Amino acid sequence: MGTPVNDKIDKFRNVLHTGQVFSLEETRDFAKWLAGLRDRKAKAMIADRIKRAANGNFGTYRSVQGGVFELKIDHGPGYRVYYFQRGKQLIILLCGGDKRTQQADIAEAKRLKEEIERRGGNETF
């Protein structure tokens, strides 16, 4: 099991969904954030983490509010990837950030999720 970040934040969980495969879609915000990272090792670690999640191995993650989840990547400034799950097999990558911008990133992820749901999710993200 993961450990709590502090007393106010949910515990991180490690989950392996054996045999479960997820489809991934990303928002423009997420793609722009990832493309803007200069740290090549971080990019590789994030890409690997997303690939593992698509194969059912979410590793360390937690619910942050309103159906938005956070993948924690233990590298550099503490990178985070925010996503939500639509149905049983679709993961939508909303945005990314690091520990320093965590609260603003969570608010943005919630806003993006609400926007996608309001539109019905039938448009390009």
Model segments located where?
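Basic, Lys/Arg-enriched alpha-helical interface segments
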Residues: 1-78, 87-91, 98-125
